[in-house]
Amino acid sequence: MNKLNLINKFIFLFKHRGFILNVFFFLVVLTFLCPSFPLVFSNPVSQPLLIRFEDVTEKAGLRFRHNNGAFGMKYLPETMGSGLAFLDYNNDDWQDILLINGKNWPNRKKSQSSMALYRNNKDGTFKDVTKQVGLHSTIYGMGCAIGDYDNDGWVDIYITALGLDHLFRNNGSGRFIDITKESGLHNPDFGASAAWFDYDLDGDIDLIVTNYVQWTIKNDIHCSLDGINKSYCTPESYKGVSSRLFQNVGNGTFLDVTDESGLFDSTSKALGVAVLDSNA
């Protein structure tokens, strides 16, 4: 190609530069918009890891069976389950399991049931140590709260129950002692849930206990769906009962401060409780 031809081509491109730029711009835009021209700007996103859970109850050695005492009378508490907690009761840095249980109703001749404490064997299995630690008690339990109320470094257990709640102190030697009476924690109602928290910021934990309804065997109501056969009643059939707040005095005893704290509510029918600082 001679020099004259090169000059002519340059003159042609210069005269038509607007058209050429427009075509170039169109191709760039088309590249971004047209799905047939995919652009990869980063590495492909890897597939999320699929996590699955396996039922290892039997393999872990957990042989617990819940007993609600039902025998055909259709009492309201039979409709409830019961709570559990993970706790390190022996301070070995392994989580143990506490399972709350119900019991048979009075005058029923079946074998009685108890809550169960399973100690972590540190190999994926657990051992039932309920009797060994002093927790083999026939309580119609509902829930539990774990906390070190006496600040001795060992977690203690509070159990909400039908009829009377219980406080078990961890003595640090592998045993729990029922100190309900001497502690001043008297809740004879339909205890449902509980939570430890330091409401007065004095360095020791206090206790809030939620109660459900006013129910006993004596005041059980006959509810029916067909007008003949008894069915389980709903909570609307019963009166409410206030939850309670117990202040930790600091000497191993508690004081009921429900009224002065403003938490008294006789219409309450509480099953759960959550503690938080909502205006921090």
Residue ranges with predicted function:
Residues M1, L33-A280:
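Acidic, glycine/proline-rich Ca2+-coordinating loop motifs
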Residues M1-R17:
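N-terminal secretory signal peptides that target proteins for export/translocation
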Residues L4, V23-L27, Q47:
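Low-complexity, intrinsically disordered regions enriched in charged/polar residues
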Residues N22-S36:
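Bacterial N-terminal signal peptides
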